[in-house]
Amino acid sequence: MYDSNAYNDDIPYVIRQNDRKFVIIPYSFDTNDMRFDGNNGFIQGDDFNTYCKESFNQLLSETDDGSLRMMSIGLHPRIIGRPGRIKGLEDFIKHIKTYQNVWIPTRIDIAKHCLEKDLFNFF
């Protein structure tokens, strides 16, 4: 039904594979907890929160004309679930929940929605 191993776009898109529709849900490394691992990334939970908030706020501002946007966040329990990091994620979720027209789906929910609504067909 879907694949999320693409890095070539910011929004999902539908392709045809073996006469069936297949949703590509792009993955992102910048809003990803893997940036805690290594020397060039996040250090504190608030670093993650701040970066995600700024990304979210920018994407939200780009919807003023009716455009659709998606923000993909890669999370790994062994990384974001650490005591010094989880609060950054919790604070970010609190921030986005203050907005009325924001949907927080799983990838399978995104794929089903794209197929049901016939969104983003590029074939």
Task: List the model feature ranges, each with a label.
Residues 1-67, 123:
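Active-site-adjacent pocket scaffolds in enzyme catalytic domains
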Residues 53-123:
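C-terminal domain-boundary segment and adjacent tail
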